[in-house]
């Protein structure tokens, strides 16, 4: 591999940002009225792992506590960008919950200066239930504690896979040097 090829490989390497710094993790949020599932990527941006479920308490005090929890996640995991699940109807139209997800995304942009991606999350909760059923996870309270995390993982993994596929297509289109 020549010097030119190595330099080109760095441009499409998911471990590099255009600024030349190391890519930091991507965090995903599955935003609901009562809970927010949180997942984070590995440092290279290949895989998604569940972090926790943030329980929403409402009111100004509850909202401040939510944002403090988000800030801790961003600092602890050196997050560079975020993905927020965008719950669209199967037709592609906006659901009522989509406006709430978009407002949350805007707040992340404004408060933390993050690059935030709204990502189609259709059927992720259904798929999350299937994963939990296949793993023999209990129903009721235990399931509610983790279902949003699993949905956030599915949203994030979909985003990471799409990003990797785009990088591969771009590299293939550039052709050999």
Predicted features along the sequence, with ranges:
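Phosphate- and other anionic-substrate recognition elements at nucleic-acid/protein interfaces
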Residues: 2-28, 34-177
């Amino acid at each position: 591999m020549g010097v030119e090829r190595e330099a080109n490989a760095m441009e499409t390497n998911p471990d590099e940002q255009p600024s030349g710094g190391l890519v930091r993790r991507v965090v995903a949020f599955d935003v609901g009225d009562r809970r927010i599932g949180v997942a984070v990527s590995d440092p290279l941006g290949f895989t998604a792992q569940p972090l926790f479920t943030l329980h929403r308490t409402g009111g100004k005090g509850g909202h401040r506590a939510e944002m403090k929890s988000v800030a801790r996640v961003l600092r602890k995991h050196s997050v560079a960008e975020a993905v927020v699940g965008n719950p669209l109807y199967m037709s592609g139209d906006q659901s009522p919950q989509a406006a709430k997800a978009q407002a949350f995304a805007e707040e992340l942009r404004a408060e933390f200066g993050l690059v935030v991606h709204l990502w189609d999350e259709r059927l992720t909760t259904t798929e999350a239930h299937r994963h939990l059923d296949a793993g023999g996870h209990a129903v009721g309270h235990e399931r509610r504690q983790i279902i949003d995390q699993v949905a956030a993982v599915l949203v994030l993994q979909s985003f990471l896979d799409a990003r990797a596929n785009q990088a591969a297509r771009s590299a293939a289109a550039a052709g050999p040097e």
